[in-house]
């Protein structure tokens, strides 16, 4: 996925979940939209280099959106609206070999208990429900999810277990939007219930896929699979 021209700045603070104050390279202070509702642990330190996109909509209250942050010497993608598109692109171009062979991909399809699946794949082999997660927290060389307690994420695991019981395929897809991770694990110290449900889901037939992205100011694309270590 190609990115638009990005604007560089320095993070002052992130607050109210969806706002951040940034100093641009010319010294101008701006308030920008933060498209991430998680804790952003490790990715929201004051003084970090950030890259912003500019909206073409003149009516937006905050025309700049925070896209990337430099964390531990590498760029990390914090925009949680991108992973679904990244995964779909990678499925369509054949990068995700485990999800080849489906004829159609539909986003945001209603299912379960008032839920929407990120991607529904359909083909001769049946249906595959893919729930996509954005991963930016890294400790050592291990990416961890979630970075905050996620009741919604717990619900998604229960929904995937249900579709597997009904005979369909269910996949939890961890999109690691940074290049310094070598594996993915549940963040048990942050959300032990999510870790418990993830292990239960995998024992129940849900599949876990994790792919690391190449992240640069010019593009973000999924490149290679990482092991999921429980």
UniProtKB/Swiss-Prot annotation:
Signal peptide: none annotated. GO terms for molecular function: DNA binding. Gene3D superfamilies: 2.40.50.580, 3.40.1350.60. InterPro entries: SfsA, SfsA_C, SfsA_N. Pfam families: SfsA, SfsA_N. Belongs to the SfsA family. NCBIfam families: sfsA. HAMAP family: SfsA. This is Sugar fermentation stimulation protein homolog. It comes from Pelobacter propionicus (strain DSM 2379 / NBRC 103807 / OttBd1). The gene is sfsA.
């Amino acid at each position: 996925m190609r990115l638009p021209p990005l604007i560089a700045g320095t993070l002052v603070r992130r607050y109210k979940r969806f706002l951040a104050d940034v100093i641009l390279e010319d010294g101008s202070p701006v308030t920008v939209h933060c498209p991430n509702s998680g804790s952003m642990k490790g990715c929201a330190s004051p003084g970090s280099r950030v890259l912003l996109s500019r909206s073409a909509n003149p009516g937006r209250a905050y025309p700049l959106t925070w896209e990337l942050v430099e964390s531990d010497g590498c760029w990390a993608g914090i925009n949680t609206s991108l992973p679904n598109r990244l995964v779909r692109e990678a499925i369509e171009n054949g990068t995700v070999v485990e999800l080849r062979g489906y004829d159609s991909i539909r986003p945001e399809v209603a299912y379960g208990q008032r839920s929407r699946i990120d991607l529904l794949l359909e083909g001769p082999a049946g249906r595959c429900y893919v729930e996509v997660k954005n991963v930016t927290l890294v400790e050592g060389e291990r990416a961890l999810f979630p970075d905050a307690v996620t009741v919604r994420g717990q619900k998604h695991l229960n929904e995937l277990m249900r579709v597997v019981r009904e005979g369909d395929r269910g996949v939890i897809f961890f999109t690691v939007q940074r290049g310094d991770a070598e594996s993915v694990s549940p963040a048990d110290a942050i959300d032990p219930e999510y870790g418990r449900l993830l292990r239960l889901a995998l024992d129940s037939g849900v599949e876990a896929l994790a792919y690391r992205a190449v992240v640069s100011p010019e593009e973000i694309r999924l490149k290679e699979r990482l092991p999921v270590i429980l």
